[in-house]
Amino acid sequence: GLKNLNNMYLIRGLNNIDTFRLSFGHLRFSASIGNFDGLHLGHQHILDSIKASAKEKDFASLVFFTEPHASEYFANISDDDMPPRICPWRDKVKLLSEYGIDFAFFLKFNPSLKRMSPEEFIKNVLEKINIKFLQIGDDFRFGKDRAGDFDLLKNWGDSKDIKVTASKTFKYDGRRVSSTWIRESLQKDNFRLASHLLGRPYTFSGKVVYGQRLGATIGIPTANLWMPKQTLPVKGVYAVKCNLEGTKINGIANMGLRPTVGGKTPV
């Protein structure tokens, strides 16, 4: 359905697009589409553009994002190793809300979306919403076989009086900022570089689940974070800062399996 999260509405799935139109069909939108894994500096550059357009034209800002990532979807159906992601999807939603986006539209990447041609995506998704400004990344592709590109969207926009632009490549130290570069940095434990590319320290959250409570037997509190069907790009033992209800606590994190107790499930 539609959920209000700290002044940002989350629309979950195309099946709720008609409900969304009933509630917000009177609004005009400044929008973007992408995966936005990590919400790094390049993504923030796009979000700044749609927020500026929304403020100038009295539009509402809207971000379409897909879950799972296409590479995760194909890895799951082929039983391959799941590719790592920078942050869980709930963290992504939280970051979009904190960044001041008005609406986040979650598109489930499933067989139906996978088979949708670029023209069908435009008709079934974009034309259902009163978009007046659309900004995409310079490498954005969409639709079946990734056949849709900026030129197709630009031609569509011109025919509908919709301004469609592609962001310029956002670079750091001469290299294009990308989720791939950040994953590589995290896998090499280069947290300083990853933080620069993200524009903030690398963080993640997860649901605390009960373990074997072995730490409690020796006076050391522990917490197991469950990461459902998601692989983070970091593995090993790290010194960390934990945020517990607003209180920061120093701690140690074991990322991956629990080797000391023969664990086989990633935590």
Residue ranges and their predicted role:
Residues 211-267:
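Phosphate/ribose-recognition catalytic cores of enzymes acting on nucleotide-derived substrates
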Residues 112-221:
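Classical nucleotidyltransferase
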Residues 32-50:
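Di-metal (Zn2+ and/or Mg2+/Mn2+) metal-binding site signature of metallo-dependent hydrolases
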Residues 32, 61-65, 166:
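Structural beta-sheet core signal
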Residues 40, 96, 134, 194, ...:
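Residue-level signal for inorganic ion chemistry
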Residues 44-129:
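Core alpha/beta nucleotide-donor-binding catalytic domains of modification enzymes
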Residues 5-33:
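Positively charged, low-complexity intrinsically disordered leader regions
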